[in-house]
UniProtKB/Swiss-Prot annotation:
Belongs to the CbiD family. The lineage of its organism: Bacteria, Pseudomonadati, Pseudomonadota, Gammaproteobacteria, Enterobacterales. Keywords: Cobalamin biosynthesis, Methyltransferase, S-adenosyl-L-methionine, Transferase. This is Cobalt-precorrin-5B C(1)-methyltransferase. It catalyses: Co-precorrin-5B + S-adenosyl-L-methionine = Co-precorrin-6A + S-adenosyl-L-homocysteine. Pathway: Cofactor biosynthesis; adenosylcobalamin biosynthesis; cob(II)yrinate a,c-diamide from sirohydrochlorin (anaerobic route): step 6/10. One of its GO terms (biological process) is methylation. It comes from Photorhabdus laumondii subsp. laumondii (strain DSM 15139 / CIP 105565 / TT01). One of its GO terms (molecular function) is cobalt-precorrin-5B C1-methyltransferase activity.
Amino acid sequence: MSDTMQLDSIWHNGKQYRKGYTTGSCATAAAKVAALMVLRQQVIDHVSIVTPSGVTLRLNVEQPLIEGQQATAAIRKDGGDDVDATHGMLIFARVTLCDHGEIHLRGGEGVGTVTRKGVGLPVGSSAINRTPRQTIEAAVREAIGPLRGAEVEIFAPEGEERAKKTYNGRLGILGGISIIGTTGIVTPMSEESWKRSLAIELEMKRSAGAEKVILVPGNHGERFVREQLGLDGQLVVTMSNFVGYMLQEAVRLGFRHIMLVGHPGKLVKVAAGIFHTHSHIADGRMETLIAYLALMGASQELLLEVSHCDTTEAAMELIAEHGLQAVYDRIAERICERMSEMLRFAVNPPRCDAIMFSFDNQILGTSRPLNDILEAMR
């Protein structure tokens, strides 16, 4: 781990949980220091980066090497107390200076290759997600200045073996790990502590007088609510995978209007009565889509194609090709019904709504006419 890292620990029920950093942060730091070393022609043993969440990391550099106009460096992944398949492995970057003025990024040994649609990256590309791509390119550009160019390769010698312990294979990402992380920071907690920390935000908003709340799975949902729906971000609370728990907490606290907003990859599960959406607990995404497509008269051929999809995005592409996007409204309506069924024993049952959106921020389905929902939420 780094010798100095501006990360706070988390305390829950008297226990301290140590934060860590993502493979994306490792790749960004490795690329930055490799670029600096090739420019200065000098080995560097520490590097600092600012993560997308605004946290500054100062990390140890391992295996630095300079060879003419090329340098290589590695950062060791540390997930804190959230130990996953990539914990402890080295993430390398190799940077070669060029005269073309552009930064070209690719994955090398141990970084997976995308072989199927539906993961948000082009088929055939390296499994380096959008945010890490941006932070890597920005860090290298900062290091080399506006005029130089660079070829940047991210690689992880242990990646192919470590990836066998992840879901990459099921998603069609083959040959290695993914370079991921939207915030750059790993925040570990036990599930109960995590749920409780989410509920605390609900309590804070209710105590401040809020009667309406929008529950989202994560950061993307919050941005969508603010930027696409034009609603106050103060209405938003993250629910993660704990849909049922957060609904019950919201009712217990007295919220009068509860809305779920998220990508179908999470929310279609709720239409099937699944209120804990982590893939380790339950899935049912394709089965739910197939059921509602069948009710709309979809062909047997389409239903079979959807059954073979590994991701919701892949199924959504098929649905669009067949012009059956109206299925999302039906699913959103059923989500709303499921919410109401769960909360029917409340003394004052709340109004429930649901909105689903795509990764490119298009509204897919709503439980009621959109204007009615937005007016009620404002």
